[in-house]
């Protein structure tokens, strides 16, 4: 079954126009170690005839050197690009692959299954619309399978295909497939994943991957590729106009425009808009793009907006429709995936980056961390590498945002270490919190005094030192 178009040879321009208009689906493959994630991607590409001859020749040669399938072609090597990955037979980094069929364009994120690479998996899942959860038919649900399911739910992925892999090793048993299906549905009952589909496959042999397999006549569903091509994705989490200002454009004294990319919704000339967090109101005078003047701008377009009124608009501000305002607060509750080997501690200052807006912030309170093996809430005072927690975050100034469930782009932020400039964590906004009305006592102390106080309370709790931030 080939997805190559005859137009490539006869009319390349028409092919490119059709290709540009195809819907794009981003999906991630995840699961436990050695569940066959990379092999599945290799099989999808191979059976769809989307591998070049030189790539195939290279894989044949590498299969003999470092392959894990004996004399057979090791399709996982198509994705495992790092030398250390090939030598160990595992995935370490997030590997991205791009391909298309007659119906859709695809971006695949192949993520590592090992627990120590959970941060890599979270990074890969953050922009995906669908997840393929692989489960080894011999082993059933593993600890890391549960971990990945929880992260997919946390990151707002609404569509999941559960691929029960290595069915060839269990004699294509319907009973084993059904027991894994029942076990997964019990797990999914506590997660917010509305669309779940199941398919039994053998990535190694190609059963039910691109074409329906005669070896499992009891399975009445469709092969995996059919689901990928036809599953309906709701790309618009919200229709509300959100335009974060990236740059103020002043080429001369006669022109002042505000540049950025429309995150969601649409706006047209003459619309009344509000600038957040200031709340000032104005009207759109013109919309400019690389292609010239526009009457209307939609999500995904990079544009320049001019307004009728000379009001203060700066980088990091958010332009919205007058009555479709977002939250503005300096206090919020969020879920955090910690990605640094240095633990997250209370009251330590970090850079908090929301799209084009960067402020200083610190954890005001740990609500709890989630044991993602049991999904139970556990009390904590710090957060270690790969752990996930719900926290209360205090920012140095009010910031404009939506909840992550409403808008995955506006409701996401990253935490940056101020000393090393390394991304230390990723956050998803749950809701804003009311700012404390009482006087902020931290203004009475220097940053050094506050950090020293935090260290003393951490390492010498028997001194009963007062918390200067309260």
Swiss-Prot record:
Chain residues that bind GTP: 31-38, 110-114, 165-168
Catalytic activity: sulfate + ATP + H(+) = adenosine 5'-phosphosulfate + diphosphate
Domain of life: Bacteria
InterPro entries: CysN_GTP-bd, CysN_II, CysN_NoDQ_III, EFTu-like_2, G_TR_CS, GTP-eEF1A_C, P-loop_NTPase, Small_GTP-bd
E.C. number: 2.7.7.4
Entry keyword Nucleotidyltransferase: yes
Domain tr-type G: 22-238
GO annotation (BP), single: sulfate assimilation
One family name in Pfam for this protein: GTP-eEF1A_C
Source species: Francisella tularensis subsp. tularensis (strain SCHU S4 / Schu 4)
One example GO MF annotation: GTPase activity
Pathway: Sulfur metabolism; hydrogen sulfide biosynthesis; sulfite from sulfate: step 1/3
Subunit and partners: Heterodimer composed of CysD, the smaller subunit, and CysN.
Protein family (similarity comment): Belongs to the TRAFAC class translation factor GTPase superfamily. Classic translation factor GTPase family. CysN/NodQ subfamily.
UniProt enzyme class: transferase
Protein's job: With CysD forms the ATP sulfurylase (ATPS) that catalyzes the adenylation of sulfate producing adenosine 5'-phosphosulfate (APS) and diphosphate, the first enzymatic step in sulfur assimilation pathway. APS synthesis involves the formation of a high-energy phosphoric-sulfuric acid anhydride bond driven by GTP hydrolysis by CysN coupled to ATP hydrolysis by CysD.
Annotated protein name in UniProt: Sulfate adenylyltransferase subunit 1
């Amino acid at each position: 079954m080939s997805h190559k178009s005859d137009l490539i040879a006869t009319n390349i321009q028409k092919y490119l126009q059709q290709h540009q208009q195809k819907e794009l689906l981003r999906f991630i493959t995840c699961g436990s170690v050695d569940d066959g994630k990379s092999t599945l991607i290799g099989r999808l590409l191979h059976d769809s005839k989307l591998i070049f001859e030189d790539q195939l020749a290279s894989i044949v040669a590498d299969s003999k050197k470092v392959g894990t399938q004996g004399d057979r072609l090791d399709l996982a090597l198509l994705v495992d690009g790092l030398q250390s990955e090939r030598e160990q037979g595992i995935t370490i980094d997030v590997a991205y692959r791009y391909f298309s069929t007659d119906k859709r364009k695809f971006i695949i994120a192949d993520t590592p299954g090992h627990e120590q690479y959970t941060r890599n998996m979270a990074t890969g899942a953050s922009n995906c619309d669908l997840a393929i959860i692989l489960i080894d038919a011999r082993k059933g649900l593993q600890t890391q399978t549960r971990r990945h399911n929880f992260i997919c739910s946390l990151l707002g992925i609404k569509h999941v295909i559960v691929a029960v892999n290595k069915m060839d090793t269990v004699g294509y048993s319907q009973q084993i497939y059904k027991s894994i299906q029942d076990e997964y549905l019990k797990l999914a009952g506590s997660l917010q994943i509305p669309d779940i589909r199941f398919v039994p496959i053998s990535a190694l042999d190609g059963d039910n991957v691109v074409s329906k397999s005669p070896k499992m006549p009891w399975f009445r569903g469709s092969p995996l590729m059919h689901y990928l091509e036809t599953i309906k994705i709701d790309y618009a989490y919200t229709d509300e106009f959100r335009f974060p200002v990236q740059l103020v454009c002043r080429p001369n004294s006669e022109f002042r425009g505000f540049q950025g990319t429309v995150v969601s919704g649409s706006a047209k000339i003459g619309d009344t808009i509000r600038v957040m967090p200031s709340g000032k109101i104005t009207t759109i005078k013109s919309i400019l793009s690389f292609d010239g003047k526009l009457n209307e701008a939609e999500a995904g377009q990079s544009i320049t907006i001019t307004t009728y009124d000379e009001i203060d608009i700066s980088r990091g501000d958010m332009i919205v429709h007058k009555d479709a305002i977002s939250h503005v607060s300096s206090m919020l509750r969020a879920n955090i995936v910690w990605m640094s080997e240095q633990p997250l501690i209370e009251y330590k200052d970090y850079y908090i980056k929301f799209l084009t807006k960067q402020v200083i912030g610190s954890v005001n309170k740990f609500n709890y961390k989630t044991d993602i093996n049991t999904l139970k809430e556990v009390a904590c005072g710090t957060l270690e590498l790969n752990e996930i927690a719900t926290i209360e975050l205090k920012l140095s100034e009010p910031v404009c945002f939506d909840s992550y469930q409403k808008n995955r782009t506006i409701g996401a932020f990253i935490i940056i270490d101020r000393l090393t400039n390394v991304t230390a964590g990723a956050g998803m906004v749950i809701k804003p919190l009311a700012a404390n009305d009482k006087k902020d006592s931290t203004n009475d102390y220097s940053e050094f005094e506050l950090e020293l106080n935090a260290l003393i309370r951490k390492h010498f709790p028997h001194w009963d030192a007062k918390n200067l931030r309260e």
